[in-house]
Design a protein with these regions (language model features):
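Boundary at the C-terminal end of the N-terminal hydrophobic targeting segment
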Residues: 30-32
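Acidic, serine/threonine- and glycine-rich low-complexity intrinsically disordered segments
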Residues: 165-275
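Signature of long, low-cysteine stretches enriched in small and polar/charged residues
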Residues: 97-150, 238-305
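Bacterial N-terminal signal peptides that target proteins for export
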Residues: 4-18
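Surface-exposed amphipathic alpha-helical segments
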Residues: 61, 159-197, 311-355
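Bacterial N-terminal signal peptides
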Residues: 17-26
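A short acidic-to-branched-hydrophobic micro-motif
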Residues: 64-112, 158-163, 213-250, 278, ...
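Long, acidic/polar, low-complexity amphipathic helices and coiled-coil-like
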Residues: 62, 66-199
Length: 355
């Protein structure tokens, strides 16, 4: 009975907040944003590509963390690399793998006489892929590590993954296909062709393989203001895991923070043409106000245009010795926090031509 009463209270707060904060009818899935409001987190916006979606990113923001996977390959980009540094790095790595011996995990003292490197090849000019194994076993066929490098326009893309022994003979064709798709680009240049955007590049072409991306943006470097966007292929089971199932865990996290929290808004909305759920928390502890906004869209397994999408906006943090209250509190008030959230979510959309 207590849970039922709590649910009624939460729903009542949600309805009141919906009417007071947005002025929209209860059936609407989008939230209007008041134009012309001076918000330091939204001073200038530019189109930004993320996976096969895009949104209007604040120019003053900085990426604090990022991760990309395509076809099971982790993609890591290093910028401003010279051709000489690329050649030296690849040559040193190949020499290391040709010199190093595989070990027997059962008898580490055994001299197996087999070098770690199994294969080395160049799918495209200025690239090198290594297939190797640090161990050898007589009873089972161990998977191989793969490590690849692609260099263009002072940009170095490194790929890492695993490949089964049963597809070892197809390694060249697999990497020929993937590496020929990779094109380097300026990060602010949004491609018009189909493809998957990652740091400094795009894997061109329609999607036939798994794709995953995570980017964290420091909206005001030096202050606790973080936007986190995570995209991956949608699967059928995602439809059974709505955001409401995670409310208990979210509440538990907030309960471990000082102060008292309240729900500003909770319910369904649209994002990038997909059905989604959101829950927006505010936590106040004296002079410190913290906002924790969450959105989850399960996506559509039938199309990569609607990936499983998770968005978090984290404004403010509990005060501590090295973070006084005036620096720990959210850099914007409640109206400003809602404006940031709705502006960025409303701008998240499928990139034209991405599919």
């Amino acid at each position: 009975m207590k849970d039922i009463n709590v649910g009624r209270i939460v729903m009542a707060r949600f309805v009141r907040s919906l009417l007071l904060l947005t002025g929209l009818c209860a059936c609407s899935f989008a939230y209007a944003v008041e134009p012309g409001v001076n918000n330091p987190l939204l001073s200038e916006l530019r189109p930004w590509c993320i996976g096969r979606l895009m949104f209007d990113r604040p120019v003053s923001s900085e990426i604090s963390d990022e991760r990309y996977e395509y076809r099971g390959e982790k993609l890591v980009t290093t910028h401003d690399v010279s051709a000489e540094d690329y050649d030296a790095k690849v040559a040193a790595r190949e020499k290391e793998l040709r010199t190093k011996q595989r070990v027997n995990p059962v008898d580490l003292q055994e001299q197996t006489g087999r070098m770690s490197l199994e294969k080395a090849f160049s799918p495209v000019p200025h690239s090198r892929v290594f297939v190797f194994n640090d161990a050898v076993a007589k009873a089972v066929a161990l998977p191989f590590d793969t490590e690849g490098y692609l260099f263009a326009n002072r940009t170095l893309v490194r790929t890492t993954s695993l490949i089964g022994a049963d597809v070892l003979d197809r390694a060249e064709s697999i990497y020929d296909d993937t590496y020929r798709r990779i094109k380097v680009r300026d990060n602010w240049a949004v491609p018009t062709e189909s493809g998957f955007c990652f740091d400094g590049g795009v894997v061109a072409g329609p999607s036939t393989y798994s794709e995953e991306v995570s980017q964290s943006f420091a909206l005001m470097p030096g202050r606790p203001a973080l936007l986190v966007i995570k995209l991956r292929d949608a699967v059928d089971v995602d439809l059974e895991q709505p955001l409401t199932r995670n409310l208990r865990a979210l509440r538990a996290t907030l309960n471990r923070m000082p102060g008292r929290y309240s729900i500003l808004r909770q319910g369904k909305r649209q994002v990038a043409g997909m059905d989604a759920e959101e829950v927006l928390f505010a936590l106040r502890d004296g002079a410190v106000t913290v906002y924790r906004f969450y959105l989850l869209a399960p996506g559509n397994p039938a199309t990569v245009e609607q990936p499983h999408t998770s968005v978090e906006l984290l404004l403010g943090a509990p005060a501590r010795d090295d973070l006084p209250p005036e620096k720990a509190t959210s850099p914007v008030d409640e109206a400003g926090a809602l404006q940031v959230w709705d502006t960025l979510l409303n701008s998240l959309r499928a990139r034209p031509g991405a599919i």
